[in-house]
Swiss-Prot record:
Protein name, per record: Putative pre-16S rRNA nuclease
GO biological process terms held by the UniProt record: rRNA 5'-end processing
Keywords linked to the UniProt accession: Cytoplasm, Hydrolase, Nuclease, Ribosome biogenesis
GO molecular function: nuclease activity
EC number in record: 3.1.-.-
Protein's organism: Chlamydia trachomatis serovar D (strain ATCC VR-885 / DSM 19411 / UW-3/Cx)
Role this protein plays: Could be a nuclease involved in processing of the 5'-end of pre-16S rRNA.
Entries under Pfam families matching the protein: RuvX (PF03652)
């Protein structure tokens, strides 16, 4: 059976300590679209609960977290460990597939796109860049899996 024929819904997540960008795609078209940001909560458990509510609302079958792998393998960031912990919490709370996807430079790419293509200044780029980065992460994942 072709995996693309099953009903699927994907949530792409670009995690930040203040804001979390979100993107969504569902079958049959699987076109990733930015759906906004969620403010990070005071704890990872509260943040996970906020994300789980979106996951349930949209009947998400797979969550794709952007995982900021370091350019040099020796350096891991605190954000990376928070992402891993948050992903594990969501996995526990939902029992759906949670994937950590290499997102190196997706935020920088989103910033460049908003600056050059949209002509937005730094303040105007602040909020949309997170959800655009999540869209780029989800698009990269879907392209690699050829789920369209």
């Amino acid at each position: 059976m072709n995996i693309a024929k099953q009903q699927q819904a994907f949530l792409g997540i670009d995690y930040g300590k203040k804001r979390i960008g979100l993107a969504f795609a569902s079958s049959p078209l699987l076109i990733p679209l930015p759906i906004g940001n969620v403010e990070a909560r005071s704890s990872l458990t509260l943040t996970a609960q906020a994300l789980v509510s979106i996951i349930k609302e949209r009947a998400v079958t797979t969550v794709v977290f952007g995982n900021p792998l370091p350019m040099q393998k020796a350096y891991a960031s605190s954000v990376q460990s928070e992402i891993q912990e948050l992903a594990a919490l969501i996995q526990e709370m939902t029992a759906i597939e949670v994937i950590l996807w290499d997102e190196r430079l997706s935020s920088a790419q989103a910033e460049r796109m908003l600056k050059s293509d949209c002509g937005l200044n730094r303040k105007q780029r602040k909020n949309p860049s997170d959800s655009l980065a999540a869209t780029l992460i989800l698009s990269s994942f879907l392209d690699s899996r050829k789920l369209y």
